[in-house]
Amino acid sequence: MKPSSSCNLLTILGPTASGKTRLAVSLARELSGEIISADSRQVFRRMDIGTGKDLHEYGAVPYHLIDVLEPGQECSVFTFQRLFLRAFQDISARGQLPILCGGTGLYLDAALRGYRMVEVPENPRLRTELANKSDTELAAILLHLVPDQHNRTDLADRNRTIRAIEIASYQPDEQEEQEPFPAIQPLVLGIRWDRAELRRRITQRLRQRLEAGMLDEIQQLHTGGVAWERLDYYGLEYRYGGLFLRGELNRNDLFQKLNAAIHDFAKRQETWFRRMERNGVTIHWLDGAGDPVAGARKVISGYFA
């Protein structure tokens, strides 16, 4: 099958542990596709087990935006969009189909909503004004600027809250010319599971990651120079794993608290996807417990021939 003029970006989304990568790889093989990761953590090298890269699943299928930054660096939504557009245009120019795959809502929005992000520079004057504010005052300022604040980690760390205020307050120069966003015609597929089954899959996967050496991976990152505070930014596995390695959690509490936190994270992802639908993104939902590949084929038959 070849891409048609009605779709130039196939997107596969779903909550964590839903089987997105496996579906993306299967469709990439059938559609001459290349996968672009929309995962805020898989961009980092040497963060393999905790982020669930599962690179063995790709086989010969080319992938992009995995292992492109060093641990300790940041990958803002602006950075992701720039990298995504570069990969999208490269894949398209070679006559292949870009397949965006992931569950990071901000990244998916940056690719699908058709507007260019603006790189926000630091504002020394604003930072000086905010320096004497309490954490509660900073949170109130951010929530005033962005009432629909989904990224709760921005409220959990003072520096992140200040940066979020900086971004929300930024007024770009009207004279600043922006390159037009390329015409993207997406077909969006989502994988949906019964809540109880998704919880079982999440718990099973966490056990597998711990057995595969996730804690050793976290320790090696820290030994290699990544501060515990920085590791906190890289997701729940690294945050709770760091607490365990610092002696602040025992093994049982690590598993129970991390497992519960990932379940809550999956709920937030599902909330984000519903928000995307309310904002006009059509998502064709597939039953994860059935045959999502067959379901996907039925949907895409009207777009590819």
Curated annotation (Swiss-Prot):
It catalyses: adenosine(37) in tRNA + dimethylallyl diphosphate = N(6)-dimethylallyladenosine(37) in tRNA + diphosphate. Gene3D superfamilies: P-loop containing nucleotide triphosphate hydrolases (3.40.50.300). Keywords: ATP-binding, Magnesium, Nucleotide-binding, Transferase, tRNA processing. Disulfide bonds: none annotated. Substrate binds at T16, A17, S18, G19, K20, T21. Catalyzes the transfer of a dimethylallyl group onto the adenine at position 37 in tRNAs that read codons beginning with uridine, leading to the formation of N6-(dimethylallyl)adenosine (i(6)A). Belongs to the IPP transferase family. Monomer. This is tRNA dimethylallyltransferase 2. It comes from Trichlorobacter lovleyi (strain ATCC BAA-1151 / DSM 17278 / SZ).
